[in-house]
């Protein structure tokens, strides 16, 4: 008998009629299991060698089973028929063959299962190494998570287990079939190997798909596998953006300094202004700052408004510093204006004094100095023509001079009047003008009526002597009466001049034109009636204003406007007469 060395170091005799490989099934199972279990996870070549050994062992087992013709285990009628047909084969031989076949089947099944588990673990570990490239602790955690003890069932695992059980059943069926089906065992074994390879490829594809998905069972997020390259890329982008921001902020600061120093100061103090100047620069394109630009639109508007306010404040301060004088400068300006107006007042008084000195000679009695009054009348007519071309302010000054002339020559007119009626009416007219300071309206009305009567009497008396003195009397007396009556008497008295107009027109037909011209101011005063309320002012102030060449009504109006201050009233009246050349 031949003996086979086993793993335990003893030689077991092989039974007669059997090959040495089949004679010791226990040693064969031990050798196969030892060869399968001695796996080192470090060398990938051992996996292929073990797979080749397993396939060789299965092939040898199939050839031995063909030679020995073992009876099937599952089909009992076949076993009984074979026992009846082969009477020479003892019963213990068939039982030993069944035990050997069962041991071989179990050993092969265990070896294939261990090999598949190791292949599965090895492929997962290599897949994690190639896809993630992570550190050794992560690889260790990955291998630990894919260990069969920690692995959770999944549809792919369930499918693989189902196929594994199916393959085990196929192997059991292949080993239990009779000899006539032995040729099909090799084909099925090859198909099983191909299915295992395809299943492993499918498993690799599924792992590659689900490598980026988060998994709660692993304890580590699957998205963290790609965190290292992604974080490196993001850090590179961040550094590029920071360099771009630094360059653009420097250029933006230079532009801001060139444009406006205040905005540059704000940009150096406020970091948001640096980003705004960066984004306002067209050469700097924002990379991923769309949200930042939207958030910084309002601060930019606020900064623009603040700069505008600062500019407005600066401009207003400049205007207030240069355009508007201070209190001291205003006082100096007023004092200088006061001095200038006083000088102007003195000039006006000096210019009016020769006319007042010459007026008594011209306003003498027409009957006594008819021939001598002709030059004066021509002079007055010339002045009248000049007054037509003058401005209203000049006309006011001329009227004031005429009034001063008439007032200064009041006594001489009274003393040299040709008749008593003219003397009485002239005295009453000038007394009425003097009484115009009182607030009684009846006195004012009497003064105007007496002035008109004196005008008519003067016209009638002058008609007897000459025609020209008549026109001169019409020019002087109605002018005084109209200037006083237009401002002092009520509107109904101005509108109704009285029955003296027909006498004037009938006695002196040449006086109609100046009367019509002098009736226009009362009609203008109707639209804007200037009836002043009665005020009592000091006579000295009124005389002072009258001495400056202004009318009584102008003096009263100016005093009423400034509240009784004679200096201010005089300044107001002088300012009205100033004509600025253009």
Curated annotation (Swiss-Prot):
It comes from Mus musculus. Residues 1-32, 56-76, 143-180, 303-325, 363-384, 390-409, 426-452, 483-529 are annotated as: Disordered. Transmembrane segments: none annotated. This is Regulatory solute carrier protein family 1 member 1. It comes from the Eukaryota. Signal peptide: none annotated. Disruption phenotype: Mice show a specific phenotype: first, a post-transcriptional up-regulation of SLC5A1 in the small intestine, with an increased d-glucose absorption rate and capacity; second, an increased food intake that results in a visceral type of obesity. It is found in: Cell membrane; Nucleus; Golgi apparatus, trans-Golgi network. Residues 438-452, 490-503 have a biased composition (Basic and acidic residues). GO terms for biological process: intestinal absorption; negative regulation of nucleoside transport; negative regulation of protein localization to plasma membrane; negative regulation of transport. The gene is Rsc1a1. Keywords: Cell membrane, Golgi apparatus, Membrane, Nucleus, Transcription, Transcription regulation.
